[in-house]
């Protein structure tokens, strides 16, 4: 395998720390200077000694900043006039800018500094001139209202442009200088002002609407009470009852009026549902994205040993809120009404809008069972005129029940949007998976090494293949071929074949199921080899093994392979190197189970049971989640599941052991059940187009070529190795094999009827050795397999002289 060249060296840590300390020092210096100048200006006294005049009482200084402060204030007032008060505020603005960008490295630019200095000069000159033109002279200052600068510039401008023209000129120069010096965007100021105005308008409008609605309801109630009174009077008057009956009727009317009044009071005091705020600004990009933006040449430079930039993916669209708090509250009120029509009394507690669905958390009344609400899911979907409604019976840490209703306008979650988050960038695992966003729009990042295997299921069109592509690309954007290796099995010959040629592949993309069985068998053998290596090294997992190998290499004493068997004295054991994490991806698991059958299930079960510490992980995907495909043996060893949209509740229970997947929306909408929990998380999967996949594959092809291991698929390439469907038996006679007699001789001499022993002795594949042992069993040379998996040799050994 080709060794990758090291990545470009990063900025030294001491230089980064120096940049941060310089910024902190500049912040402290700016802040102290601002406070000192403001204190000197506010406590200025003309009797203090100064630059523009002398003082008879030089020994006593009234200025709080001392003699130096008195001189500074006198100079600033002499030159700038009233504008001297603005000068410390400008320094405070620069201190605030240094504080905002304190986590970014220090970057000196002479051109940018000169540009900021020009803006400051324009700002000071224009401000002083405006102060001279529009303010009167004060006896307490050493100069005019605009100082020496303002007086000179103001008089010149008034002679040429008059007061109005001079004012317009200096206002324009003042705004220009303010923009250049503070990097202020007036368009952004207008946007913020407009947003605040609209928010205030919506607030007042909502309050007015609530007051008007309450007033109308009160009028309606009063009218109903009057109508009831009239009907009672019409009924009671002709009969002329006695005084006791009249008193009882009046008491009933008073009680009814009091009940209605109490109902109206409770309705007015009803706390409205809390609407969770949507993210007003996009997620802060990660350090990797900022680094790629600062180095645009990095996009086109395909250097071996580097990772492709995230910028080759399609950028995310700008998120626009397609709802208002009033519309969400209206749907919540409608939900309460519909549930009340079905005899379930609830109140909406909070509303959580998201990119695809909105979750309404409701508080059931006392005595209402959650099962009653769950059984009304289809009726609610019909009543609310939506495609489906999902009921979340248990929300951890809350007493509410979740009702998830799809949004009218669904937002697309771009894959680049998830990869650009700090959560993905800070993940250390080489098999980090970026799945998408949760219902609140937050990224969902998980680690395949902790799962340690994943079962994915969903019908056609549910987004299953796109989800598998997103998982593979997550690994390709996180790890190089020295950290992660892939074995891809693609029975459909369409989905995973586009990854052919990337350097992460251990073997070509497997499309023949005979090769798939051999690839899984090689994975089991590699798992056993790694466990033996780790046992010899005294470590418990792959990360500990790699750490020990790295420490030995750094110390200049690389470790030799302890499992190497020397054939001669002169042979030297090869040196140990870092072992990559291996991910086996099967796109259509059901098709492989139909063709290969029981043997593959046993191999998958062995990998799922033991391969976590060895760094071998499985991703099994199928569009037919039936019990004959996802068997109990596989489900018991793969606790992490991912269910896309399925056709029935039975299929949902087959995948995640509970319903809910049949109510998903498709197109990437999934239920992800992390390991160690039985509560699934609803995730909106990230969308990856075919063009993006091709761009990533081409980027990796430019960075290196694959180094295939021929031993992975060699088992089916042995001469005379037929393959017959799911049984795995050869179609030709095993006794006609050229090595059959030699195999019988070895078994009789060693008295060991083991497939692995014959395989090692004759250096042949597993299938061929198994057929020879089965032929010996049929010929009566060995017995059938015992309960412990061993065989006994029946035929006598060769006669020795």
UniProtKB/Swiss-Prot annotation:
Ion transport recorded as keyword: no
Q: What is known of its domains?
A: Consists of an N-terminal domain, which is sufficient for the localization to the septal ring and is required for cell division, followed by a linker domain, and a C-terminal domain, which forms the translocation motor involved in chromosome segregation. The C-terminal domain can be further subdivided into alpha, beta and gamma subdomains. The alpha and beta subdomains multimerise to produce a hexameric ring, contain the nucleotide binding motif and form the DNA pump.
Keyword annotations for this protein, in alphabetical order, are:
ATP-binding, Cell cycle, Cell division, Cell inner membrane, Cell membrane, Chromosome partition, DNA-binding, Membrane, Nucleotide-binding, Transmembrane, Transmembrane helix
> What is the protein's known function?
Essential cell division protein that coordinates cell division and chromosome segregation. The N-terminus is involved in assembly of the cell-division machinery. The C-terminus functions as a DNA motor that moves dsDNA in an ATP-dependent manner towards the dif recombination site, which is located within the replication terminus region. Translocation stops specifically at Xer-dif sites, where FtsK interacts with the Xer recombinase, allowing activation of chromosome unlinking by recombination. FtsK orienting polar sequences (KOPS) guide the direction of DNA translocation.
Q: Which GO terms describe its molecular function?
A: ATP binding; DNA binding
> Could you tell me which cysteines form disulfide bridges?
none
Q: Where in the cell is it found?
A: Cell inner membrane
- For the region Disordered, what residue ranges are annotated? 715-736
List the Cytoplasmic topological domains: 188-801
According to its UniProt entry, the protein's GO biological process terms are: cell division; chromosome segregation
What is the gene name? ftsK
Full protein name: DNA translocase FtsK
Matching Pfam families, A to Z?
FtsK_4TM (PF13491), FtsK_alpha (PF17854), FtsK_gamma (PF09397), FtsK_SpoIIIE (PF01580)
Q: Which branch of life, at top level? A: Bacteria
The protein's assembly and partners: Homohexamer. Forms a ring that surrounds DNA.
Organism placement in taxonomy: Bacteria, Pseudomonadati, Pseudomonadota, Gammaproteobacteria, Pseudomonadales
Report how it sits in the membrane: Multi-pass membrane protein
Q: Which residues cross the membrane?
A: 24-44, 73-93, 117-137, 167-187
Q: Which intervals hold domain FtsK? A: 441-653
Binding of ATP, residues: 461-466
Name the PROSITE patterns for this protein: FTSK (PS50901)
- Organism, by scientific name, is Pseudomonas syringae pv. syringae (strain B728a)
User: Known InterPro entries for this protein?
Assistant: FtsK/SpoIIIE/SftA (IPR050206), FtsK_4TM (IPR025199), FtsK_alpha (IPR041027), FtsK_dom (IPR002543), Ftsk_gamma (IPR018541), P-loop_NTPase (IPR027417), WH-like_DNA-bd_sf (IPR036388), WH_DNA-bd_sf (IPR036390)
Mention any one GO cellular component term assigned to this protein in its UniProt record: plasma membrane
């Amino acid at each position: 395998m080709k060794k990758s060249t090291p990545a470009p060296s990063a900025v030294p840590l001491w230089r980064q720390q120096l940049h941060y300390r310089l910024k902190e020092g500049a912040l402290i210096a700016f802040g102290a200077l601002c406070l000192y100048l403001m204190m000197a200006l506010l406590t200025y006294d003309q009797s203090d000694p100064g630059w523009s005049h002398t003082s008879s009482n030089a020994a006593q200084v009234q200025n709080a900043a001392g003699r130096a402060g008195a001189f500074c204030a006198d100079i600033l007032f002499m030159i700038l006039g009233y504008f001297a008060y603005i000068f410390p505020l400008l320094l405070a603005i620069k201190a605030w800018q240094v504080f905002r960008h304190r986590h970014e490295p220090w970057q000196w630019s002479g051109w940018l500094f000169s540009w900021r200095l020009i803006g400051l000069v324009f700002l000071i000159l224009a401000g002083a001139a405006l102060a001279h033109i529009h303010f009167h002279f004060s006896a307490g200052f050493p100069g005019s209202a605009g100082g020496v600068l303002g007086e000179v510039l103001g008089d010149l401008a008034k002679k040429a442009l008059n007061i109005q023209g001079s004012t317009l000129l200096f206002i324009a120069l003042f705004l220009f200088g303010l923009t250049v010096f503070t990097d202020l965007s007036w368009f952004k100021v207008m946007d913020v002002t407009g947003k605040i105005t609209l928010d205030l308008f919506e607030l007042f409008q909502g309050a007015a609407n609530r007051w008007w609605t309450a007033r109308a309801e009160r009028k309606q109630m009063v009218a109903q009470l009057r109508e009831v009174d009239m009907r009672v009077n019409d009924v009671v008057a002709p009969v002329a009852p006695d005084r006791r009956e009249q008193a009882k009727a009046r008491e009933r009317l008073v009680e009814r009026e009091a009940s209605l009044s109490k109902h109206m009071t409770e309705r007015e005091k009803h706390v409205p549902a809390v609407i969770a705020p949507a993210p007003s600004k996009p997620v802060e990009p990660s350090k990797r994205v900022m680094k790629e933006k600062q180095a645009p040449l990095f996009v086109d430079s395909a250097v071996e040993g580097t990772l492709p930039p995230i910028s080759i993916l399609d950028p995310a669209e700008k998120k626009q809120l397609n709802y208002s708090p009033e519309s969400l509250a209206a749907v919540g009120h409608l939900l309460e009404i519909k549930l009340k029509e079905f005899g379930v009394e609830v109140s909406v507690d909070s509303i959580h809008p998201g990119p695809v669905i909105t979750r309404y958390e409701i508080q059931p009344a006392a005595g209402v069972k959650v099962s009653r609400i769950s059984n009304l899911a289809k009726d609610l979907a019909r009543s609310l005129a939506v495609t489906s409604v999902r009921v979340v019976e248990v929300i951890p840490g809350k007493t509410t029940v979740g009702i998830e209703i799809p949004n009218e306008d669904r937002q697309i979650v771009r894959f680049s949007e998830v990869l650009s988050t700090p959560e993905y960038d800070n993940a250390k695992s080489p098999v980090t998976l970026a799945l998408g966003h949760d219902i609140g729009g937050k990224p969902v990042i998980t680690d395949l090494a902790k799962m340690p295997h994943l079962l994915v299921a969903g019908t056609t069109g549910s987004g299953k293949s796109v989800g598998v592509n997103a998982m593979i690309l997550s690994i390709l954007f996180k790890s190089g071929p020295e950290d992660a290796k892939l074995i891809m099995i693609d029975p459909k010959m369409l989905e995973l074949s586009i990854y052919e040629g990337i350097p992460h592949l251990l073997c070509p993309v497997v499309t023949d199921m005979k090769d798939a069985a051999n690839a899984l068998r090689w994975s089991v053998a590699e798992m056993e080899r790694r466990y033996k290596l780790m046992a010899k090294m005294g470590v418990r997992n792959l990360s500990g093994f790699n750490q020990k190998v790295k420490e030995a290499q750094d110390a200049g004493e690389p470790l030799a392979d302890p499992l190497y068997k020397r054939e001669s004295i002169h042979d030297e054991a090869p040196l140990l190197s870092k072992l990559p994490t291996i991910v086996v991806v099967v796109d259509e698991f059901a098709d492989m189970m139909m063709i290969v059958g029981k043997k593959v299930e046993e191999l998958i079960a062995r990998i799922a049971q033991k391969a976590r510490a060895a760094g071998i992980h499985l991703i099994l995907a199928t569009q037919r989640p039936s019990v004959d495909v996802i068997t109990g043996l596989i489900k018991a060893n793969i606790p992490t599941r991912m269910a896309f949209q399925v056709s029935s509740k039975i299929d949902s229970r087959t995948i995640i052991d509970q319903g809910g997947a049949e109510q998903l929306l498709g197109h990437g909408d999934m239920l992800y059940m992390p390991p160690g929990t039985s509560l699934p998380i609803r995730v909106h999967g990230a969308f990856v187009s075919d063009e993006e996949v091709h761009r990533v594959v081409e980027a990796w092809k430019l960075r290196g070529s694959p180094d295939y291991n021929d031993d992975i698929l060699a088992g089916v390439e042995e001469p005379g190795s037929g393959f017959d469907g799911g049984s795995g038996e050869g179609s030709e006679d095993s006794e006609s094999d050229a090595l059959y007699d030699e195999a019988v001789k070895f078994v009789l001499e060693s008295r060991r009827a083991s497939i692995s022993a014959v395989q090692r002795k004759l250096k042949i594949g597993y299938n061929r050795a198994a057929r020879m042992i089965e032929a010996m069993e049929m010929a009566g040379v060995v017995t059938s397999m015992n309960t412990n998996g061993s065989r006994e040799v029946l035929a006598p050994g060769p006669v020795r002289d």
